From Swiss-Prot:
GO terms for biological process: carbohydrate metabolic process. One of its GO terms (molecular function) is beta-galactosidase activity. It comes from the Eukaryota. It comes from Macaca fascicularis (Crab-eating macaque). The active site is at 186 (proton donor), 264 (nucleophile). This is Beta-galactosidase-1-like protein. SUPFAM superfamilies: (Trans)glycosidases, Galactose-binding domain-like. Belongs to the glycosyl hydrolase 35 family. Pfam families: BetaGal_ABD_1, BetaGal_gal-bd, Glyco_hydro_35. Glycans are attached at residues 97, 243. Residues 1-27 form the signal peptide. Probable glycosyl hydrolase. Transmembrane segments: none annotated.
Amino acid sequence: MAPKKPSCLRSLLLPLSLTLLLPQADTRSFIVDRDHDRFLLDGAPFRYVSGSLHYFRVPRVLWADRLLKMRWSGLNAIQFYVPWNYHEPQPGVYNFNGSRDLIAFLNEAALANLLVILRPGPYICAEWEMGGLPSWLLRKPEIRLRTSDPDFLAAVDSWFKVLLPKIYPWLYHNGGNIISIQVENEYGSYGACDFSYMRHLAGLFRALLGEKILLFTTDGPEGLKCGSLQGLYTTVDFGPADNMTKIFTLLRKYEPHGPLVNSEYYTGWLDYWGQNHSTRSVSAVTKGLENMLKLGASVNMYMFHGGTNFGYWNGADKKGRFLSITTSYDYDAPISEAGDPTPKLFALRDVISKFQEVPLGPLPPPSPKMMVGPLTLHLVGHLLAFLDLLCPSGPIRSILPMTFEAVKQDRGFMLYRTYMTHTIFEPTPFWVPNNGVHDRAYVMVDGVFQGVLERNMRDKLFLMGKVGSKLDILVENMGRLSFGSNSSDFKGLLEPPILGQTILTQWMMFPLKIDNLVKWWFLLQLPKWPYPQAPSGPTFYSKTFPILGSVGDTFLHLPGWTKGQVWINGFNLGRYWTKRGPQQTLYVPRFLLFPRGALNKITLLELENVPLQPQVQFLDKPILNSTSTLHRTHINSLSADTLSASEPMELSGH
């Protein structure tokens, strides 16, 4: 419920600071005191020590638990993004229900005595699909994202005219807990340097939210020139390995007076498929925080609880090559992906307690964990067997292949089909020119798996077939770019494939609704498919199993499997990529499972190769840094704590 009068939230906020005074209803304020380089909350000196938590990466039933642990850690504020694409899946269609209920999350934060620093974008990065921008923007292929392009501004205006009035009652001076709002996100790193765009956003925020709310920007030190704007308070972001004195000195060139603010102090870092799990040492993170607090700076720790990229929501980076972000967003944060306190949390709480009061009482204990299995999965059938169910509307036909965006397929998978126009007796090279596979293509001839083509890889497949042979290419969107100078990351086959010297034409595109099929699987009469002797290529496996007694959080381990997608009782857990790593387990919150003997169902879509024993197991610890080359007896004994490798800190990218 939104606050109706200023007094209703005031009592909740009293424990936030020793210096917080009892304000009258008309004196609630959060402002910059430039004369004394500090913030004032209701007229009293105030400094926030905040942490990032993304409601869209945490199931709603777990919000209160995570927020309570953040408050116990000594934080007096939280910071979070609002992903546009999470709330407006199609133009003019809005969703604020369930885990998308932003107002409910604001209320949970208030109940936990936490102020809010809101970052509504429109672009958020966050290692989230397309940086939070909806992919339907790309249905206008020439659109210039994050600029003053009229098409982009029209879409932004329409979205903010829905979003910002919803949060208006929650502004601090209106009785809510939102003390400040970020405009855009690290705009200086984008490269456009379009000040007209930033001025338009600032004007839109003021028109819809009024003059009292503090608006600010955040950039890495190299992005301050193009990311800051007069009238918006300038803040910076950096991690424990960076030179704090040098960066804050640079910040003073853009914001000579007022409090120093690090809006993203990195407690850890993200993971990419194919690279080591990133960690940051407890000593480095705590030392950096203490040094900033000694300067009187306000700090937000990114992340304090990372959560999970469920479903298809992970983003991607392009650092010389395309890098897809893992399903786990554990981030080596003070609160683990499963919501458990880590040694980093207790060390940070000790630092915070030197500068401000922290709540008394015991921290809620770690959630109970459980182990189940191993379970042997059963072959359901090849993906092609269910094509009529996966694409009930039938294919879209075109001479040349069309992108996901052109056929309104936002995420997931699309099947491309054509037929060989002549017999090919010898193995003949097959490829897609100009790096035109976005992002992975699983190639089949007459239903037989031939191999994979991957973005940024120059590999070719060698195909044979008779005239009229069916050529199927299942293309996977591995997540749109979420950071960098170009967010227009189109998916699918961007160029027509070539077989030998022949450009292939006459395509059928099947946008697949796999989640719908899995969710309602038990209602359907499934067609029979002849089981291949050695199953390979995109294939469904499943297993029903009971859990006797109560359930606990657990981690799904898929030893020997290659790459694919997993559903538990119809819920899309996300991607696994056992062969590439580093992530080897998927977090399964206990509320997804049925207890006391009720049947649960796990469904896998394995895209490449199945192990000789198609088994999975639920573990009581995560494995976030490993590869499938480790022996199973060894891999089960490892955890993220024992398999961590630090990497150089990067200044920005969130």
